[in-house]
């Protein structure tokens, strides 16, 4: 499951038999930062702060918004967890994969399938599929099996850097050979079940505070056991996700993986440091360094608090309302949404959901006009409902995250783009504007959003539009059209309002 051009597999050496060398499970002690530890007070304070902030954030969200936000956070969690492994699949492409819209490039398609697998597993977890079993040997194996079962064949192979032997990863199978990860030689293959049994024994029956602290400790200790040939990092992060979900009732609306990925060097350094042996008489009583484990727990909990704080800021009602309604007004001016579309979204933001019968009242118009607005917003991907008569709920699409939820994940920029000196196209956001007979799409120059458009005539004459489906013609030739817009922009050939317009007589 590594990048084809940069394979850094876990395996270092092979053993012919899956034997147990009899290592004592005390090798991975301490498994917890105990009550008597000099590090405990500071960590307990962080655990309590995390619990309070998580509860407050969850209470601030209507249940319907909680569900919608959790869907976007799954894509975010998947993006950042895979990014830590060197796999960069933007959430916009992840969202496309969930609609079975895959890249023609084989490697990008494989990464989309990998992302879809991750989201499928997390959705199963968020739905309670692993409740009470996340820390059991069988539960950990099931995470791995479900994830790897959905991976394309090319992502199920790792290569020994010394022998060049290619070894296939079997979904859910415990590691059959010895491995070395950095400077750490993992326990023998036959010993893995014993270590997982001890892991379950310690982490499955903890008080709430210990369970919060244990989420950090267990994250490293599972990586230390290294139960699988590959995929251990993602399994550990999914396990941490479910531990926090169950212990803190997070609602799955924030992701510690985002914090790890944004501080990836520190994350990996802390994990490596936790492999260190006990340093002196002040460093606990286990075989491994208690101080290193405490520092990682501090980092882990601080990242959690940081991510809750970040999501709280994004979801502040007044600010979220302003960003969404600003986007709606822009769409209305472009003719892409009907007038008063903002009334529907504002009502949902205030109430959490909107019964269909109340839509006409919300917009102050006829039922027919209200249905037209609802249809347009649904087609745009920002409204959903569980059925034809069910209440309307908000959706947070990845394509609009940069407008609605800025900073949630990075903009998708073209390779070699220079901020402030280049027009890039971070996310697909195109629509046909009937009254102007143009397809409008958006570029980005640094922090500035640049409106671009191509005429229906240009699409018909040069891009197989044929006056049938202009948006479909645009999407079929999107990269070519974006490159034309980029060249015009860089040459300074702009309209008076700073936009880029592509006409047939220029092509």
Enumerate the language-model features and the residues they cover.
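FIC/Doc superfamily catalytic core
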Residues: 1-419
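Short alpha-helix boundary/capping segments
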Residues: 110, 451, 466-469, 473
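Short, surface-exposed linear segments at secondary-structure transitions and domain or protein termini
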Residues: 264, 459-468
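Short, ordered beta-strand-loop transition motifs
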Residues: 386-388, 431-436, 494-495
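Short, charged/polar N-terminal "headpieces" of proteins
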Residues: 420-443
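A short, structured beta-strand/loop element
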Residues: 437-463
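Acidic, low-complexity intrinsically disordered segments
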Residues: 469-507
